[in-house]
Amino acid sequence: MGARIVGWGHTEFGRLKDDLEQLIVRSAREAIEHAGVDPTEIDGIWMGHYNGGLVNDGFPSSLALQIDPKLRFTPSTRLENACASGSAAIHGARNAINSGNTKIALVIGVEKMTGKDTKGVTESLMTASYQ
């Protein structure tokens, strides 16, 4: 038996006033509820997040612990792979499940690109390319 996706959640797309933490919490709570799991059953969190200076928080994986107090002390890992950061998080969680180290994983892909003007976002996105 391999890894499978059993629940999901997402925010609407667009220019949202929510900060990064609010986006993480809102979508992850929805995914946990949709999956029908208790947060105590989650034994690993993988977060795909490309920063590149888009937000001031350089350590967003710890923000996942705000989703539910029951997630306190749950290992949370951030993966960054430019535009494929969310996919990298899925692969990381899948590998942990298939290895037997994790039974139930929470995978989060998050980005906040509307906190800067066009020039600022362009400069941030350029950091994902060879310079």
What are these regions (language model features)?
Residues M1-E21, E30:
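Condensing-enzyme catalytic core mediating Claisen C-C bond formation in acyl metabolism
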Residues R4, N51-I104, I108, K112, ...:
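Conserved catalytic cysteine-centered active-site region
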Residues V6, A31, I42-I45, G86, ...:
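Buried hydrophobic positions in well-ordered alpha/beta secondary-structure cores of metabolic enzymes
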Residues E12-G14, M47, R78-L79:
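A short, structure-level motif marking secondary-structure boundaries and short turns
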Residues D18-V25, E41-M47, G52, F59, ...:
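Metallocofactor- and cofactor-centric catalytic cores in central/energy metabolism, strongly enriched
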Residues E21-G36, P60-S61, A89:
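Short, well-ordered amphipathic alpha-helical segments that serve as non-catalytic structural scaffolds
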Residues A35-P39, L54:
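Short secondary-structure boundary/capping segments within folded domains
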Residues D38-G44, P75, K103:
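Short acidic capping loops at alpha-helix termini that bridge into adjacent secondary structure
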